[in-house]
UniProtKB/Swiss-Prot annotation:
CDD domains found in the cross-reference section: Adenylation_DNA_ligase_I_Euk (cd07900), OBF_DNA_ligase_I (cd07969)
Compartments (UniProt record): Nucleus
Name of the gene: DNAlig1
Keywords, sorted A to Z: ATP-binding, Cell cycle, Cell division, DNA damage, DNA recombination, DNA repair, DNA replication, Ligase, Nucleotide-binding, Nucleus, Phosphoprotein
Any one GO molecular function term: ATP binding
InterPro entries per record: ATP-dep_DNA_ligase, DNA_ligase_ATP-dep, DNA_ligase_ATP-dep_C, DNA_ligase_ATP-dep_cent, DNA_ligase_ATP-dep_CS, DNA_ligase_ATP-dep_N, DNA_ligase_N_sf, NA-bd_OB-fold
Protein name, entry field: DNA ligase 1
Cellular component terms (Gene Ontology): cytoplasm; nucleus
Pfam families: DNA_ligase_A_C (PF04679), DNA_ligase_A_M (PF01068), DNA_ligase_A_N (PF04675)
Gene3D superfamilies given in the database record: 3.30.1490.70, DNA ligase, ATP-dependent, N-terminal domain, DNA ligase/mRNA capping enzyme, Nucleic acid-binding proteins
Function: DNA ligase that seals nicks in double-stranded DNA during DNA replication, DNA recombination and DNA repair.
Length: 747
């Protein structure tokens, strides 16, 4: 955190990445009619850059204009710095000129959050200002610069039109509400193409061919809209209305949805069309994920609080510690209260130090779960915990579940990635009162749901649980019975417990809840500091159809660390006694056509880890083993629905690995391997262990689909680097190198 935030105070050149060579895009005749879902492989695609979009050719004799970029004035040079010249509006001005609008660029070093907010006289944020911000961010290579640009826009909104901050934030991460509410757009591309045709007079085949060429319906929509002449220009869009209309669209269906999409698209100008269409598709494609947005929001808040001391958009060094503290407080608050409708009004009204008090955790709003670090053996556990008091719990092979009850007695069930699974488990809700002991009005418990054999009274494999219906579950038709194993209590009767140690939380859990055979059980646990007892308990857990053990501290460093993969929880699985300490959860980003017996399906796949710092997917291996014929058929049918015409701009890979088809990052697989090694081809964790090489898996083998994880919850680059460095052969080499360095230094 310290490193990434303080980097904002370095020179601009330090915060940006070097440009990559342009991507070659195959030319396609715009008048050639393509099938509804064609898959065209891009030529010599470079994974590091976004495609350069050429001006569209037009049906008949109509001419089109290329997409307008944000206009930039010639640079002015003085003795100290070179900077963009940005038109500023005087503090007493009453109206923005056309030049003010066209030159709006929150990435400029001379940008002033108040003076350059050209909408300040109307107090309503134009959607075009947000769209231009997105456009600049999309064209920016450096992540820190992207965050700084967004922070400038947020600061302007805070100062000029604070009521627009909530919709601006949601639109920046392409959400319409907190994630746990499940309100999503996801309008089909075919529907949007028809709306674009209706609004612009374009031919549907032409729109399809251009979308195939660019891989981006948003770009096609913008170019179609820019080239269109209109007798009467609709009133300009503003952020508040666009957000409200998008929420309406999400709740509508049929022709009424189509009509509203059409009416909104007709009102779009310039880059508004691009990002409006992308929002409807559900892929904004600007590279801003939630953690980056929270950082931008924190920096924007500090700029706003010290606007009189800021020279343009630059924050004086004296406030850099405040930025670090504000970012940490904001991210911590969001972990326990993931709702911008609550957080943003609080940061605008109260001091940031009051944020956690103003945004408390409460039932019905999921927390980001605490996660465990993998270990390779019992000895490593005792090396980590030393003389601390520890407890070992069986690690159940099921689905993580955070179960909430509010004061009204309403039950909510959330997955590890905050997805609302309440409708999936009506049977658990029906029997939830039997769990209670004593006066319990509200609670949040952390648990694991497993498939349960009622007759044999034993746990069934995860694969059985995965066959259970996810939606529209009728309690009378449930075939897979479940049992809940509870291992933590986070909230009870209005009191948050996350700052208490595990011993206290467990005591309260046993006081207020009780087991019900085959329905509700406490995790089987053993408190011990004896290494032989831990080894024996591990073997017992495996016989009990579990994955292994979770080892936790009881008193020291034993608070519940929300949203953190903590070294105070260690997982010890039966597979850990091999060279690699853990399986990996990887994202499928590409597929290779099968040959021989596998003809007609994909025979192999390209997998990637997720780099949370750079918000990109980095290739880590090609995989073709561990699949049954049925697996390959299932994967091919599912992934075939998510093929894209080119690699995403946030995929990092070597061109030699290019698959036959690229996929959207929609599915996570659990994978085992023999070991990890440095690779000149794969890009996983590149720059962490080695400056020029990434890390790859040797002999990867498919284990299962992880439906409980989304792509951004996949194994991240830092975890991959840690797993590589934890291997015995790597540690031995490091020791040898260190010894040689010491000897060289001595002599």
């Amino acid at each position: 955190m310290q490193k990434s935030i303080t980097s904002f105070f370095k020179k601009k050149s330090d915060a940006t990445d070097s440009p990559s060579p342009p991507k070659k895009v195959p030319k396609i005749d715009a008048k050639t009619e393509l099938p509804d879902e064609p898959h065209i492989k891009s030529e010599s695609a470079s994974p590091e850059t976004k495609p350069k979009v050429e001006p569209m050719s037009v049906d008949s004799e109509e001419k089109t204009s290329p997409v307008k970029n944000v206009k930039k004035e010639p640079k002015e040079v003085d003795d100290k710095t070179t900077d963009k010249k940005v038109t500023t509006i005087g503090l007493n001005s009453t109206a923005a000129t056309k030049e003010d609008v066209e030159n709006y660029d929150p990435s400029a070093d001379s940008y002033h959050p108040l003076k350059n907010a050209y909408w300040k006289d109307k107090k309503v944020t134009p959607y075009l200002a947000l769209a231009r911000t997105f456009q600049v961010i999309e064209e920016t290579k450096g992540r820190l610069k992207m965050i700084d640009t967004l922070s400038n826009f947020f600061c302007s909104v805070m100062l000029v039109s604070p009521e627009d901050l909530v919709p601006s934030v949601y639109l920046s991460i392409n959400q319409l509400a907190p994630a746990y509410e499940g309100l999503e757009l996801g309008v089909a591309e075919t529907t949007l193409m028809k709306a674009i045709c209706k609004a612009t007079g374009r031919n549907l085949a032409h729109i399809k061919s251009q979308t195939q060429l660019t891989g981006d319906l948003g770009i096609v929509a913008e170019q179609s809209r820019v080239s269109q002449r209109m007798m009467f220009q609709p009133a300009p869009l503003n952020v508040r209305d666009v957000f409200r209309k998008l929420r309406e669209i999400a709740k509508l269906s049929g022709q009424s949805k189509m009509d509203l999409v059409y009416n909104m698209f007709v009102a779009c100008r310039s880059s508004e069309a691009r990002f409006f269409i992308r929002s409807l598709i559900g892929k904004l494609r600007i590279g801003i994920a939630e953690q980056s947005l929270l950082t931008a929001l924190a920096i924007g808040l500090v700029k706003k609080n010290h606007i009189d001391d800021c020279k343009a958009s630059k924050v004086p060094d004296v406030y850099k510690d405040e930025i670090v503290d504000t970012t940490l407080l904001l991210k911590t608050a969001y972990c326990q209260c993931p709702n911008y409708d609550i957080i943003i009004p609080a940061i605008l009204k109260y001091d940031i130090k009051e944020l956690q008090e103003r945004c408390p955790m409460h039932p019905g709003m999921p927390l980001r779960p605490m996660l465990a670090q993998p270990t390779k053996g019992v000895h490593e556990v005792f090396e980590r915990f030393g003389g601390m008091q520890i407890t070992c719990e069986w690690k159940y092979d099921g689905e993580r579940a955070q179960i909430h009850r509010n004061e009204k007695g309403e039950i909510s069930i959330f997955s590890r990635n905050s997805e609302n699974n309440t409708a999936k488990y009506p049977d658990l809700i029906a029997r939830s009162t039997a769990l209670l002991k004593g006066d319990v009005k509200s609670y949040i418990i952390d648990s694991e749901i497993v498939a349960w054999d009622v007759e044999r009274k034993q746990i069934l494999p995860f694969q059985v649980l995965s066959t259970r219906k996810r939606k529209n579950v009728d309690i009378e038709e449930i075939k897979v019975q479940v049992c809940v194993y509870i291992f933590d209590l986070l909230y009870i009767n209005g009191t948050a417990l996350v700052t208490k140690n595990l011993s206290e939380r467990r005591k309260l859990l046993l006081e207020h809840f009780q087991e019900v055979e085959g329905e509700w059980k406490f995790a089987t646990a053993l408190d011990t500091n004896d290494i032989d007892e831990v080894q024996q308990f591990l073997e017992e857990s495996i016989k009990g159809n579990c994955e292994g053990l979770m080892v936790k501290t009881l008193d020291e460093e034993a608070t519940y660390e929300i949203a953190k993969r903590s070294r105070n929880w260690l997982k010890l699985k039966k597979d850990y006694l091999s060279n690699v300490g853990d399986s990996l959860d990887l994202v499928v980003i590409g597929g290779y056509k099968g040959k021989g017996r596998r003809t007609g399906t994909y025979g192999g796949f390209l997998l990637a880890c997720y780099d949370t710092e750079n918000e990109e997917y980095q290739s880590i291996c090609k995989i073709g083993t561990g699949f049954t014929d049925e697996d390959l058929q299932t994967h091919s049918e599912f992934l075939g629905k998510h093929v894209t015409s080119a690699a995403k701009s946030y995929y990092r890979y070597d061109p030699s690995l290019e698959p036959d088809h690229w996929f959207e990052p929609v599915q996570v697989w659990e994978v085992k391997c023999a070991d990890l090694s440095l690779s000149p081809i794969h890009r996983a964790a590149i720059g962490i262990v080695d400056g020029e090489r990434g890390i790859s898996l040797r002999f990867p083998r498919f284990i299962r689909i992880r439906d409980d994880k989304n792509s951004e919850n996949a194994t991240d680059a830092n975890q991959v680097a840690h797993m590589y460095q934890s291997q015995d052969q790597v540690k031995n080499n490091q020791k040898s190198s260190t010894q040689m360095e010491m000897e060289d230094e001595f002599y």
